[in-house]
Amino acid sequence: ISALTDEKYFQGSFDFLPSVSRIAPQPILCKDFIIDPYQIYLARHYQADACLLMLSVLDDEQYRQLAAVAHSLKMGVLTEVSNEEELERAIALGAKVVGINNRDLRDLSIDLNRTRQLAPRLGHGVTVISESGINTYGQVRELSHFANGFLIGSALMSHQDLHAAVRRVLLGENKVCG
């Protein structure tokens, strides 16, 4: 489960991390623009189990430093890529869990083909997460051929009934007659 902690752009909060941790047994990902080791220490203090490191905002040395801090705290790292150059860097850096962001952060457009094109280039030992733009069960089913998991936010959070929204994305629209 990912929790937004960036306050400036996404109205997130580190306070979300322990709140989610109390009600969900799954590992909690701190989703933020992490650029400083302090943010990782803070995330761990607030009970995050993993952190997001975006190659679009980090150079290789920054990534190595931040990943080392996370690993020293027994935290997982989700390495985010959004294009071929970043994918090659993730491979060279030895990333074990790679998130492919289907959203172009420059214009916010969505292209699910990004997961279809980039995921096959990752090795068998790499866990692939498809991020952003996933709204339907059909998309989850089709992309599951390329990804081991999904980060789905807007499609769920825009609904009043979160439980029903999760069921729709995971199971589809199933009418039960009786």
Model-identified regions with their sequence ranges:
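N-terminal active-site wall of soluble small-molecule enzyme domains
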Residues: 2-78, 84-89, 115-118
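Conserved strand-to-helix beginnings and helix N-cap segments that scaffold or border functional pockets
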Residues: 13-14, 63-64, 111-112, 140, ...
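A generic structural signal for alpha->beta connector loops
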Residues: 25, 74, 94, 125, ...
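Catalytic cores of alpha/beta
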Residues: 35-47, 82-94, 130-152, 164-169
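Glycine-rich phosphate-binding active-site loops on the catalytic face of alpha/beta enzymes
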Residues: 42-62, 99-108, 146-166
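Catalytic-face loop-and-helix region of soluble metabolic enzyme cores
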Residues: 97-146
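C-terminal helical cap(s) of enzyme catalytic domains, especially alpha/beta-barrels
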Residues: 115-122, 158-178
